[in-house]
Structures are given as C-alpha cells and as structure tokens.
Regions:
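Catalytic Walker B motif of ABC-type/P-loop ATPase nucleotide-binding domains
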Residues: 166-170
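Helix-to-loop junction immediately C-terminal to a conserved catalytic motif
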Residues: 58
Length: 261
C-alpha cells in the first residue's frame, strides 16, 4: 500500500512564505522543499509557528506572502494526498467505539460521504492495523488501549486515506518513553514503505535518531537538509539553554541571551 508512482515535482514546495492571524505575523520568509521519501523533523519553541505551518500546508490558512504548492497544486487541492495526525485527539471514553471503526474513519472523503464502506475499504483498514502492529486490537474498545496504542490507532487512521505525505503534530507528547521509542520505530518503518513524513516534535534527544533531516522553526525556518541538531540551529531557534545528550552525557547548548550577560 505504498504510493504507486513517484512525483516528478516536490510533494511540498514553499517559497518566501509569510503567514499569520489578523495583524500578527507568525511565519516569516519560510522556504522549504519536501521531496518524496523525506523524513523531516521540525523542532522549535512553543509559539514558534510549527502548527501554523501545518495549517498552511493543509490549506486551512492562506499565506499573506509567498507561494506554496502541495503535489504541484494549491494546498486546498493537494491536501487529499496528505494524512494528518493532530497534536490532541479528543475522544469520549464512555463511547464504545472499536479500534477498527476509528481507523475506518480514515476512508471517509468526498467520494465516500453517505455511501457504505466497501470490501476495499475493509481491506485497507486491516492493512493499516497491521502496519501499526495492532491487528489483534481491531475489535477492542478504544478506551481500553494505552496512550501509546491510541496514538498508533490515529496514525493508522491517517494511513487509511493512503496518503503520500504524513503530517504529525507532536505524536509522542502524551506517551511514556517506551511508547515514544515504539512510535518513532513505527514511523521509520512507514517511511521505508514509501510514505514521506513531516513531523513536529520537542523530543530533541530522540528525534535525530530516526528522522533523515531536521529543521528548527521559530517564526523563521533554519533548515539545511542535514540530520544533526547543531548549536547554531538551537541558538537561532530557541534563544535559551537547551539540554541535549551527546555520547550518553548531558551537555548544555548556550544560546544568545547567556552569551550576552
């Protein structure tokens, strides 16, 4: 269930883009190209515009300046090729919905509204459950799953739309260390299967072990197509001390405000 053909054009191409809300500019002069098979991690402080960037890519927020193409099209048209896992997904623990039914929601779309699910839909759902290693939980109520398992269900739901690009906003924000590692391993597998991934994360100590390249976004984007989290990137993006792990030992990356004391 991997994409059948590679795109001649980038999946996402952003040039000199600025965007925001009312009179507040949140993103400024953003340039980013997402190529097929990329696995890009975006780090940065809260309020730095990471979620806003996702809204622009999904066509939910128009840019105030610059251009963006998704699959060579306007985001409103190209987003049908995108699977999205939001930062927070509300669910009613008293509602007896099964895991399989949650994943099946990913098959909804303009072509499926008011139509019964097909045998093809059911097959895709089962494949997605297998991809996130939850086949045995298909008939279980969602409320019985752990936080990490629920997050894998939401990833499966996004995969059910058979996307070429997967956007994930803080996929490990509410899970423990073990579940975090499992989710990143899962995303690594999905990327190897041909799905391009762009994710937001605060797990600086984990993210560089799995993604192919890293960028730091704090209103402006510091991205050079490299995997290493550099001191310059942290200083430019955070403007504060950040603890990283190097060779198994914690060390502090000093940012500008300490240097200027």
């Amino acid at each position: 269930m991997t994409p059948t053909a590679a795109h001649a054009t980038p999946l996402v191409e952003i040039r000199d883009l600025s965007a925001g809300y009312n009179n507040e500019m949140v993103l400024k002069d953003i340039n980013l190209t997402v190529e097929p098979d990329d696995f890009i991690g975006l780090i940065g402080p809260n309020g730095g515009g990471k979620t806003t960037l996702f809204k622009v890519i999904l066509g939910l927020l128009p840019p105030q300046k610059g251009t963006i193409k998704v699959m060579g099209m306007a985001p409103e048209k190209g987003r049908r090729h995108i699977g999205y896992v939001p930062q927070f997904t509300y669910y009613d623990s008293d509602f007896p919905i099964r895991v399989r039914d949650v994943v099946r929601m990913g098959r909804l779309g303009p072509k499926h509204l008011f139509k019964p699910y097909t045998a093809e839909d059911d097959q895709v759902v089962e494949e997605c459950l297998e991809r996130v290693h939850l086949t045995e939980k298909g008939n279980a109520p969602l409320r019985e799953l752990s936080g990490g398992q629920r997050q894998r269900v939401y990833i499966a739901r996004a995969l059910a739309s058979e996307p070429e690009l997967l956007l994930l906003d803080e996929p490990t924000i509410s899970v423990d260390v073990e579940a975090t590692a499992q989710i990143y391993e899962l995303l690594h597998e999905i990327n190897l299967q041909g799905v391009t991934i762009l994710l937001i994360s605060h797990d600086l100590n984990v993210i560089s072990s799995y993604v192919k390249t890293i960028g730091c976004l704090n209103r402006t984007l510091h991205y050079h197509g490299e995997k290493e989290i550099t001191a310059d990137m942290i200083q430019a993006g955070y403007n504060c001390p950040v603890e990283l792990i190097a060779h198994g030992l914690p060390h502090r990356v000093l940012a500008r405000h300490e240097e200027q004391r």
